[in-house]
Amino acid sequence: MISFASDYIAGAHPVIMQSLLETNMENLSGYGTDQYCAQAKEKIKQAFQCPDGEVFFLVGGTQTNQVIISTMLAPYEGVIAAKTGHVSVHEAGAIEYSGHKVIELEEKDGKLAAEDIKKCIEDFYSDDNHEHMVYPGMVYISFPTEYGTLYSKQELTEISNVCRNYEIPLFIDGARLGYGIESKENNLRPEEIAELCDVFYIGGTKVGALCGEAVVFPHHNTPKHFVTQIKQRGALLAKGRLLGIQFDTLFTDHLYFEISKHAIAMAERLKEVFHKKGYTFFLESPTNQQFIILENEKMKELSENVEFGFWEKYDDNHTVVRFATSWSTDESSIDQLEEYL
């Protein structure tokens, strides 16, 4: 059985595992105050050219989204997101559970448009009853989106300008940030992403780590008592070294970006195979997630030898499925897939 089910089905990249083994017997302080966390933070700030930024490490994506949104919003505020956004669909109501409404907007290929965000905010304030409503207090987007698509520099700049005009923070979910940055279609540099938003995170779980996400407040704009609020939400890891060592390794010798480049190269090869075999794409993704429309019978047949992710029902006879690549994807797996197709 070969698997393209997700980008976190394997363990950690071997270099990360080696770092964890080499440091295993060191006695280090807890809660992210160790030397490896400190080194990782400096390397991240250098990579994204935000010397005044502050970096914090959390364990997983849903936890990170909930912590960021709930600490940055007032109790009466909600977060604007695409109706297909991760916080809208695939986090079991985690944001709502923290007391904040997700204000869903229509999207195109997973992306929000600046004009739609602006209209949402303007419509809110033009309503005479807006004091009885949930205030739009943040904009959430992901890079790449749930569909693997990317915001261009112009699109992200326009969204950033709307947020700054209305003085609400822009939050970029970077669970797969490396794949977005290394995509051939990307025209945003890491430092431009940091400059245009108010908070973002660098995904480790889906980009080679065992677990872990690095939250970055690039403009010295961390919420008050942020570490205390992380602790209050049960998200402060006592053995913070686990995260620090991994991110220190990921941001040594460009490993994070090399991992991402490899996954993109494998995804390009995957696309070639599906095109060669005459399959239809649900949309053209420039990153490591590829969405294919399969006949239901073919899907059933293929699933006997290949693992992939269900995405959505296309019609009565077809289903959209997802194939994802990662650091562990190799040429031989794609060769096998080609035979099964």
Annotate the PLM regions.
Residues 151-183:
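Catalytic PLP-binding core of fold-type I/II PLP enzymes
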Residues 99-137, 141-144, 151-158:
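PLP-dependent aminotransferase-class I/II
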Residues 108, 135-136, 142, 150, ...:
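Active-site C-terminal subdomain of aminotransferase-like
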Residues 54-73, 103-110:
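Conserved core of the PLP fold type I
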Residues 71-89, 118:
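Conserved PLP-anchoring active-site segment centered on the Schiff-base-forming lysine
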Residues 13-61, 83-84, 88, 94:
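Conserved N-terminal alpha-helix of the aminotransferase class I/II PLP-enzyme fold
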